[in-house]
Amino acid sequence: GGFSVVQALATLGWASHRGAYFRSELIAALHILDRGAISPQGMTGSYAGAMGQPQFMPSVYLKLAVDYEGQGRPNIWTSTPDSLASIANYLRKSGWHAGEPWGEQVVLGPNIQPAGIDPDQAQPLGSWLSMGVRRLPRAPAAYASLPARLILPDGVGGDSYLVYPNFKVIRRYNPSDFYALSVGLLGDIVT
């Protein structure tokens, strides 16, 4: 976004029901400026203060941004390597398990009644398979012990997915199932 982060946070800090949160983010943004990480004019972001390519809030930048290129400070505004390394650091610190899948698309057998399945109830993969969930031919390596949840993002009749703990980590970055599915599916394509 092209909004001044300082102005956006200052406005929200006093004109929002979440004022205390935005005031603390404003203080974090001022710390970033004080460190010389970016100029006030360059510190742009969303209307809510999310900054740079990864859309980090200032407090997240201070905790997790990475100077991958070795320029002396993380540059999430114009450096793609710094941005990608910062996102990877965010996911790692949020509990990402390298080598484990985020999830997989599955086919529901005729005996499965999706309306009766609690989307918050995780079960081992083997339990889902015994209930009639079928894996697709190009599914990731099976992790029989990983807890999996069944989600139907488009409702009954739409696509079905078993999602593993790494899916929850993606949702810590953005709490939308649609966002997390998009990231997971795109990641599968590029790897």
Sequence positions of predicted segments:
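Extended, non-catalytic structural segments that build the interaction scaffolds
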Residues: 34-49, 167-171
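Extracytoplasmic/periplasmic, Sec-exported soluble proteins
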Residues: 1, 17-21, 45-53, 75-83, ...
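Flexible, glycine-rich surface segments
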Residues: 40, 47-52, 56-155
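Primarily short, surface-exposed interaction patches in extracytoplasmic proteins
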Residues: 5-40, 62-70, 74-77
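C-terminal functional modules
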Residues: 138-191
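Extracytoplasmic/secreted proteins, especially bacterial periplasmic and envelope-associated proteins
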Residues: 4, 8, 21-28, 52, ...
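Short N-terminal secondary-structure initiator segments
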Residues: 1-15, 105-108, 112
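Structured segments of extracytoplasmic/periplasmic soluble domains
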Residues: 12-15, 29-36, 63-67, 89-97, ...
